[in-house]
From Swiss-Prot:
<feature type="glycosylation site" description="N-linked (GlcNAc...) asparagine">
    <location>
        <position position="338"/>
    </location>
</feature>
<dbReference type="InterPro" id="IPR002591">
    <property type="entry name" value="Phosphodiest/P_Trfase"/>
</dbReference>
<feature type="transmembrane region" description="Helical">
    <location>
        <begin position="31"/>
        <end position="51"/>
    </location>
</feature>
<keyword id="KW-0472">Membrane</keyword>
<dbReference type="GO" id="GO:0047429">
    <property type="term" value="F:nucleoside triphosphate diphosphatase activity"/>
</dbReference>
<feature type="glycosylation site" description="N-linked (GlcNAc...) asparagine">
    <location>
        <position position="453"/>
    </location>
</feature>
<dbReference type="InterPro" id="IPR017850">
    <property type="entry name" value="Alkaline_phosphatase_core_sf"/>
</dbReference>
<protein>
    <recommendedName>
        <fullName>Uncharacterized pyrophosphatase/phosphodiesterase C725.05c</fullName>
        <ecNumber>3.-.-.-</ecNumber>
    </recommendedName>
</protein>
<keyword id="KW-0378">Hydrolase</keyword>
<dbReference type="GO" id="GO:0009141">
    <property type="term" value="P:nucleoside triphosphate metabolic process"/>
</dbReference>
<dbReference type="Pfam" id="PF01663">
    <property type="entry name" value="Phosphodiest"/>
</dbReference>
<feature type="region of interest" description="Phosphodiesterase">
    <location>
        <begin position="74"/>
        <end position="404"/>
    </location>
</feature>
<feature type="topological domain" description="Cytoplasmic">
    <location>
        <begin position="1"/>
        <end position="30"/>
    </location>
</feature>
<feature type="glycosylation site" description="N-linked (GlcNAc...) asparagine">
    <location>
        <position position="467"/>
    </location>
</feature>
<feature type="glycosylation site" description="N-linked (GlcNAc...) asparagine">
    <location>
        <position position="67"/>
    </location>
</feature>
<keyword id="KW-1133">Transmembrane helix</keyword>
<feature type="glycosylation site" description="N-linked (GlcNAc...) asparagine">
    <location>
        <position position="306"/>
    </location>
</feature>
Length: 485
């Protein structure tokens, strides 16, 4: 049964048109180039090359290799650093990651899918599908067809294939095509999906240390050729957990990203000792960023509508509301619409949508598991009620995600190295949405991709932009933070 007192307790754990809109967003920054078109026609080409954001698609390459002892088939390692915001890279605590980014392939940021929450985005990364398509629409949600509730921290949900079979993860396609996979604690890896499981699979365990995760990857790579996996995926929740508990700007956050970076350095050294560091493809990415919370950015729901009308609330910290009946849904929606039109201060900093009116760029309406009424707070704002938070206490957690996936504070990480990415060294890559990762992995492993929402088909886009990635990210973060004051 839904209880407001439990809100947040379990949360610590582009289509072509979208791409065009996104590129246009950055093209607007090139005011000098646009003006020059009108008055300096002879210089148009030069200005476009210097200033404009322009996607040029280049393919990824694959192939086997020999490290001097063993023949390795095309191999890719994907390591997810949950909650690692793109700009964390420039805080001075991650020299190993920064070195990898500077010497290999670095995308300024990876665009998460909406909502920018852990489970939906991890399943998007391995299926190439938007959450509305693969069905894991939040960390917690209700399925009106089965009458069951999904909660990410409940083992029975992670082991029930009926939650996961709307999407086919990359390891299923790999196993079907005789490519061995090894999956460490990735959402969805504990179930049989479309008749397949990973060759090697580790269930989630909060107590597993970063070094144990690193050792597990190297252990798999040390297997004999007949047993060795070509696709390895590993999940690390540590940055996200600390970001929630202490906030994205805390000393504790800087400590944990430093610890993560040290272990990444040890992993790279392990690859070098095996003489495979130049050949094995390794991708470090994240699912979303993190925004700071504040007692000054709370949106109180108590006076907006009768909270007892809510039978299920989904997608914390967002408000996906579902009543016991259609009449309850209508009441909740109309109450929020009417309140939003008032002149009260609490009527600001959020938007209300019916499911059918959710912005199309979020791709978040075409699934029965998506709640009928949505209250979306502005970035950094939190929905609360007297039932789950006392005004006399400091609001927790101190860091939250889930907001608009184009917000600078929701931006994710993408760094890659290895033989398949050699054509991209020294190139300035353009940001892309995480629906593209599936195609990249399929291309590296020479797998026939299943239908997905990616549009680059295993390629990567280049950008033309004079600003450094560091300047770009930090300026956008500064502007985003200025709106929170």
């Amino acid at each position: 049964m839904f209880s407001w007192a439990n809100i947040g307790s379990n949360e610590y754990l582009p289509l072509k048109n979208d791409r065009k809109a996104y590129l246009n967003q950055w093209a607007k920054r090139s005011g000098l180039a646009i003006a020059a078109i009108c008055i300096l026609g002879i210089l148009i080409l030069a200005i476009v090359k210097l200033f404009c954001f322009k996607a040029i698609i280049f393919p990824i390459v694959g192939g086997s290799f020999n490290n001097g002892t063993n023949v390795f088939q095309s191999t890719v390692i994907v390591i997810s650093l949950d909650g690692f915001r793109a700009d964390y890279l420039y805080r001075g605590f991650t020299p190993n990651l920064l070195s990898l980014a500077e010497r290999n392939v670095h995308v300024p940021f990876l665009i998460p899918s909406f909502p920018s929450i852990t489970f939906p985005n991890h399943y998007t990364i391995v299926t190439g599908l938007y959450p509305e398509s693969h069905g894991i629409v939040s960390n917690n949600f209700f399925d009106p067809v089965t009458g069951k509730q999904f909660v990410n921290s409940m083992p029975e949900c992670n082991k029930d294939p009926t939650w996961w079979d709307k999407g086919e993860p990359i390891w299923v396609n790999a196993e079907r095509n005789n490519v061995r996979s090894a999956v460490h604690m990735w959402p969805g890896n504990e179930v049989e999906n479309h008749g397949y499981r990973p060759t090697y699979s580790d269930g989630f365990n909060f107590d597993t240390t970063l070094r144990e995760k690193k050792d597990r990857i190297l252990e798999w790579l040390d297997l004999p050729d007949k047993d060795r996996p070509q696709l390895l995926l590993a999940y690390a929740p540590h940055v996200d957990m600390v970001g929630h508990a202490f906030g994205p700007d805390s000393p504790e956050l800087n400590i944990i990203i430093q610890e993560v970076d040290i272990v990444i350095g040890e992993l790279i050294e392990g690859l070098k000792k095996r003489n495979i560091d130049k050949h094995v493809n390794i991708i470090f990415l994240s699912d979303h960023g993190m925004a700071p919370t504040s007692d000054n950015r709370l949106i109180w729901l108590d006076n907006m509508f009768n909270l007892s009308a809510v039978a299920h609330r989904d997608a914390w910290p967002l408000g996906g509301f579902r009543g016991e009946s259609d009449l309850d849904d209508e009441y909740i929606y109309e109450s929020l619409v009417n309140y939003s039109r008032s002149s009260l201060p609490s009527a600001e900093n959020w938007n209300v949508y019916s499911k059918k009116d959710i912005p199309s760029r979020w791709h978040y309406s075409n699934n029965e598991r998506i709640a009928p009424v949505w209250m979306i707070p502005d970035v950094g704002w939190s929905l609360v009620s007297m039932l789950d938070h006392s005004p006399e206490l400091e609001y927790e957690p101190l860091g939250v995600h889930g907001y608009d996936n184009l917000s600078p504070v929701m931006r994710a990480l993408f760094i890659a190295s290895g033989s398949s990415f050699k054509n991209f060294k020294g190139k300035k890559l353009a940001p892309f949405q995480n629906t593209e990762i599936y195609g990249i992995l399929s291309h590296i492993l020479d797998l026939p991709a299943q239908p997905n929402n990616g549009t680059y088909e295993g390629a990567l886009p280049l950008r033309r932009n004079r600003n450094s990635t560091k300047e770009w990210l930090l300026k956008d973060i500064e502007q985003a933070y200025s709106k929170l004051i």
